[in-house]
Every structure is written in structure tokens, then in C-alpha cells.
Amino acid sequence: DGSRAAAGDHMIALGSSGPHSNGYSLIRKVMEKSKPSSNQLDSLIEPTKIYVKSILSLINELPVNAISHITGGGLLENLPRVLPSHLAAKIDPTSWELPEIFQWLQAEGNIDITEMYRVLNCGVGMVVVVPEAKSQLTIDHLNICGEKAWLIGEVVKSNGKQILI
């Protein structure tokens, strides 16, 4: 429920396999204007990544204060849902490169990055919130489980906004 999250906690991203069945109204609009390559089509129909084995393994080994599945609503709507109202998610957009399919969608659809973060997962399928002291152990554990994991941000005291990018 996220009630254990605290300012200073680290946010660890798990890479997505593609859009994960979200944002397809927007994706269809882009595809009406621009024809995707066969590789891009493959990315668009890649099955949604399932994280259950990795997450169960993680929570059995290390403390996890909150978990956010980045579905419809993207980072902007999903991260605030798992944090108490006095906290905010501070995301570092330079911590990862948008996967190619999301770069193509943004360029061909002329989509503002804020809209991308609101509608699509932008390559981030899940975020786990962990104590700062366990951040690197969490990343290492998830990588051993076969995930692409990285530090995407931290939990901070809210200044009235629940997400800062």
C-alpha cells in the first residue's frame, strides 16, 4: 500500500517489453499517419512482461516499501498512487534512454514528453521503492532475476506535486 515509503527512499525501475497493452488509442493515431517498420510492429505486439517471479523473489530477500505497476496513466499517474500524499516521486529522465519504439512514437506523433509520460510506460514497466541503503542490492537482485533494473529516482517530501520530472 506504500505506507512504508519515506523521503530518501530510492525508486528502482524495471524495464518494459514495449507498450504493455497501454496507450493504443494514441499508438493507432500515430500509425494512421506513419507506417511502422516490421521491427517496430514487433515491438508494438510484444507480449506484456510479467514481473511476478522477480518481484516475489525480491520481496522475500529485501525490504520493499512500495510497488507501482506502470500501466495506463504512465509514470505520471501510477507513481503517485503508491505514495502517501505528503511524499512525491522525483524521477531522473536522464537515467534511461527511451526505447526505440517510444522514440519513434514521439517523433512520428509529435507527442510532447509530458504526454508520453502520462500515456505510455516509456520503457518502465514497474517501479519498486526501497530504502536507499538497499538500492544497489535491489538492482543487483533484479538483474540476477533477468530484469533490466536501474535507479530512476527517489522519494522526496511533496511541495504540492506528487511527481517531479
Could you describe each region identified by the protein language model?
Residues 1-35, 162-163:
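Phosphate/diphosphate-binding glycine-rich loops and adjacent basic-rich segments that engage nucleotide
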